[in-house]
Every structure is written in C-alpha cells, then in structure tokens.
C-alpha cells in the first residue's frame, strides 16, 4: 500500500488535531457534573457511558495523521485503565494539555529533547510527592467514598466497601447483570468454581437440587474415571471411615458413575461426582489449588500416583462441600496455612510476570479463591442500555477501590495534581529542561479546570484558588464549596492519579520529539459498479 509522509510542524499539527478530537469527546465526562457520551453500536442498542477508555476505543478518524494522533491518546487511556482501572479521562486531559503547551514552546524555538528531559524529571518529582502525600485507606468509609466517587453513586460505593470488608483485599468482586431492579450483594465463603454434579441423582436435597456433604473427603484426579475396579479399593477405605466423598475429576463415566449413583440411592454410601473446572494447564493448576486448600494430593500419572494404590492420606478434607448442578463450593479446607500462603505467593508472582489481561484476570480469580473469597454484586436496571452503563460503572469503581487500598489516597477533584506544583521550587533545572518542567506545571491544572468547566464555573479562577489553598483543600464541584476534600470523602487513589500523569507524559514526550509521520495513503473511492452489468435498455 502506498504511504504518505508528513514532516516537522505539519506532522505534529496533524497528530494534535487527532488528539484534540478524541480528548474533546472524552473530557466532557470529567467530574461530578460531567456528562455522558452515547456510542453507536452496529448491532443492538447504543451504549451510554462516562468511561474515558470506552469512548476512546470507539473513535476512528478518517485523516491518516489525525487517526495516528488519536491512537496515541487511546494508548494513554488504555494503559491507565490496565494499571489502575480508572483515571482514563484525567490521563487524556493531561496528555492534551502537555502536548498543547509543548507545541507552543517548540514554536517559540525550544529544543524538543530538552523539553522531554524536563518533562520526565518533573513527572518523577510529582510522582514521588504524590506517593509521599498519600494517606493509607484504613476505614470502610474511605473505601466507600472512593468507590462512590468513581461510580458517581454513594450506594454503589457502600456496597463495594461491604464486599471488600467481607472478602478482603485479595478477594474477587465480580459484577453480574440481574433480572431484578436495584443492587444486591452475594458472598461466598471458601472456594467456589463453575462446575456442578455430573448427575442429578447425587442431590441430597431434591427440592433445592443440591448435594451437601458434611466433614467430607475430597478425591482429586487429573484424568477420567470410568472403570469401577480402579476406584473400588479407595471406596472401601472411605466407606469404613464413615465419611462422605466428593470426587473431582476430568470426568466420571460408565460403570464408575453407575456404582456411585446406585450406592447413593440405596443409602449405602454418600458421594458426589464433579467435573474439574477449566481446560488443559489451567485445569491442572486449579486441581493443585484445591489439593493445597484441602490438604490432599492430585492423583496423576505425571507424579506417579494411581487410583488403585491411593490411600486416605492422599485425599483432601473439608468441613463442608456444597454442590448444585452449576457450581461447587468447598468450605473450610483442611490444608496447612503455610502451604496455602506459599501457593498464594506463587500465583502473585505469576500475575506480576504475566502480560496477558486474560491470564492476569484468571490468576487473580485463583488467588482470591485461595486467599480471600468471592463477592458477587448483582446490578439491575429498567432498560438494557442503563443496565450495561451501570454494570460498567460498578466494575470501574471496584478496580478504583482496590487501587486505593493498594497505594493509598490523595485529595480528589484534581486538587492533588494542582497542588503538586510546589515541588518545582526544589527542581534545579535550566534552559529547555526548565521549560519542560514548566509545561508539566501548567498541565497539572488541566483536570481541575476541566472539572470547573463541566460544573459551569470559571476555570482560571477555580484553578488559581485551588493551587493556593492548603494541601488537601479544593473545590467540591458537586456543591460548589471549597473544603477539605479528604474529610469530605472526595478522594482519588494515588495509583490512579500517578498512572494518569505518568502515561500522559510518556506519550506527550514522544509526541513532541516526532519529526516525521508515515501513514497509509487513503485509497480513492472507485467508480460505482453498474448494477445492470453494462446491459442497457432494461425495463422493469
């Protein structure tokens, strides 16, 4: 495909137009009085959202240079969302301000590499300042305030705080769509996975269609069980112990399954057969998690263990196993605390080293099942459009709350960034580096100005007042009052604030040092095809 090349000012201005087109669409959502954006979908109802990254992903521009400019800012929003789960609009607003100021200074003759070094040093200083100023999240109320601001709804914040209180900071909080109106919270203690019993005959409560095994043995097998002779020696030992047995295997079929069902119906022996969750390596890992949680071992040929020779010492144990047709919950496994902690550390290390969002999410789920618990927030709404928007807001707020617990909180409303300008007094920079640092100083006011604009206030006046207020004092845009924002429960996770600044400055610095852009040349539209195939004189 033919390429088109632009140089110097033309290249940078083309990129800036794309950046501005995207940023202008995103920044209207910032703050408590920010508006929503409607996104058209090719199929189904349109989506209404105030999430910066969702809006950014939908924007495709026609001009090749503008398209690249927009893609660069999309990267800022996406990276901030990946790291912190929120702050995508703030990151976009900061990137726009940094690029605008940077290009203005370059037009006045500043050297782009000097500006880049100055921007990097200034951002490093501001990041250190923010981390130092951050307050640890110690109370349920602080989590509720942080999540409530992210979701724009205090009720959602309180529900998330309650969920985190119950499952701990390592626990998984999932959001599901509900058929009923409003919000509900469901909590699960122990390990739950999405596989139920293989046959309904295993149910101990026919009305509720669930099997409940108290003080049960748990047999974990990595392969299929089909012949009863493999299982018989172990079954006899379990029957003698008088305890029920839960079998979790790749599958249980044939005469092995028939024998278990017949014994269950006759009341000879209480058992339940369950398919292991997941596939391939993930299934092996989850079985190993269960083994560590219950104090048993996975019977697998890979480690030289077989069913025929297995004894009771290889079985896991749990206070209770609850199985329905769709899911299984293991409560209070008998595994040793040290082994569980070791496994948790191992999974945490895998999360750190993984570069796949999907893998990270699955590892996080495994971690929660071992270390904390699972909370499910069920959200309902009057229409499908509202339901999607609400679910998205809750998911963002959950990630926001987790970020707050991780690194602490700073004053919200853009105040923490605007007041970080004081660190520039300690930076001894000269020439273009000092100019680069000043670009950052000016850009730090951009979020508070945009919040003021969206609230119908004068941005310059608000920014000036916030900048010169005591640390932590700023504008509560919802009420129009200047107050101690942390005391008023208006806070942002420092992880979100610093990620927004770091990612915005990274792209802005690259933007300013760009001297040429190579893009695909737009193809000329071909002549319309004659539907008659060139055959004239056709009458209908």
From Swiss-Prot:
* Record keyword Cell membrane present: no
Please give the Gene Ontology molecular function terms for this protein. ATP binding; ATP-dependent protein folding chaperone; isomerase activity; unfolded protein binding
User: Does the record carry Ubl conjugation as a key word?
Assistant: no
**Record's catalysed reaction(s):** ATP + H2O + a folded polypeptide = ADP + phosphate + an unfolded polypeptide
Compartment(s) where it occurs, according to its Swiss-Prot or TrEMBL record: Cytoplasm
NCBIfam families for the chain: GroEL, PRK00013.1, PRK12849.1, PRK12850.1, PRK12851.1
Q: Spell out the subunit comment.
A: Forms a cylinder of 14 subunits composed of two heptameric rings stacked back-to-back. Interacts with the co-chaperonin GroES.
Name recorded for this polypeptide: Chaperonin GroEL
**Organism of this sequence:** Tsukamurella paurometabola (Corynebacterium paurometabolum)
As recorded in Swiss-Prot or TrEMBL, the protein's gene is named groEL
